[in-house]
UniProtKB/Swiss-Prot annotation:
Domain Core-binding (CB): 14-101
DNA-binding found in the keyword field: yes
UniProt-listed Pfam families: Phage_integrase
Name recorded for this polypeptide: Virulence plasmid integrase pGP7-D
Native species: Chlamydia psittaci (Chlamydophila psittaci)
Length: 307
């Protein structure tokens, strides 16, 4: 460590929470919210000491910390900790240490997940996604209610479900991403290592006409607030909740639920996996199969009676 410049040494005198705040500020809104919750969890459960200087992590055994996270059964307040929660906190810690590795130019090493057979840090918890789906009838009722409340958020939801898109992709649209002549919208899909992939999605005439009516002659962000700024995620969730309440939906209707419902619907309708993967940007058939709502018959039901 003696070879470090003074600039890099000074970073080791940041506290864990100070460094975490710097890290969180570099993340996208949804990731920031999730990882802020993760850091708070790790500090509250004495996995991390928020007041400790970063120099205390130089000789830290990351494997021990990951094992402590994975060994939790209850929080300090007595709440049970699920496997999904433990894996999410472990992912948060690993990502945080990778940031510290970059921040300190390698002085603090980053944590790596264990792949030991029988005790891996990460493993598949369930075959099917936990998200509840809504039926076509339910989303038609939802959109009727949403259209009366907020035409902007109605259009956002329509682009999500018709194009199998994520909310962040839709609210990031700019007017130059839309070709009304081709009935086509170009989405920028974020991939790993801050790379972006452009995905062109064709929409039906009536939806493109509604979008054109909403835009008028405006340029810039497609979906804007009353002040003309890019619409915030929480605004969309607010109006979705109002529409959900109007139809007394037993299922919480969120942008994620709309996208998941679209994937489940396409699978149910028998569209080819490769086609669904191409438009949704899912990277494997295994990921797509998690949205398959079809019941698989037990093999024995297809055999002749033995007795």
């Amino acid at each position: 460590m003696s070879g470090l410049s003074h600039h890099h040494k000074s970073r080791l005198f940041l506290t864990v929470l100070e460094a975490a705040n710097v890290w969180l500020a570099t993340l996208s809104p949804i990731t920031r919210k999730n990882y802020a919750s993760g850091i708070k969890f790790l500090v509250a459960n004495h996995i991390l000491d928020g007041s400790m200087k970063l120099e205390g992590l130089v000789c830290c055994d990351h494997c021990d910390i990951l094992n402590r996270i994975k060994s939790l059964t209850f929080t300090y307040s007595g709440k049970p900790v699920s496997e999904a929660s433990k894996q999410a906190r472990a992912a948060c810690y690993i990502s945080f240490t990778k940031f510290l590795y970059r921040l300190t130019k390698g002085v603090i090493k980053h944590a790596s997940p264990s792949k030991d057979f029988g005790n891996p840090t990460f493993y598949k918890i369930r075959d099917k996604v936990k998200t509840e789906f809504i039926s076509k009838r339910e989303w038609l009722l939802f959109f009727d209610a949403l259209k009366k409340i907020s035409f902007r958020d109605y259009l956002i939801g329509k682009l999500i479900i018709q194009g199998v898109r994520k909310l962040t992709e839709v609210i990031s649209l700019r007017t130059e991403d839309i070709s009304f002549a081709k009935n086509q919208v170009t989405f920028k899909v974020k991939k790993r290592q801050n790379r972006y992939q452009e995905v062109k999605v064709s929409y039906p005439n009536f939806l493109m006409q509604e979008l054109q009516d909403y835009l008028g002659n405006r340029e810039g962000w497609v979906f804007v607030s009353g002040e003309g700024q890019q619409v915030a995620i929480n605004q969309v969730y607010y109006y979705f909740k109002l529409a959900e309440g109007d139809i007394n939906s037993p299922i919480k209707v969120t942008p994620h639920v709309l996208r998941a419902s679209a994937l489940a619907y396409l699978k149910k309708m028998g569209f080819a996996d490769q086609e669904i993967m191409r438009v949704s940007c899912l990277s494997s058939t295994q990921m797509l199969s998690a949205y398959d709502t079809g019941m698989t018959d037990n093999l024995t039901s297809q055999l002749p009676l033995i007795f």
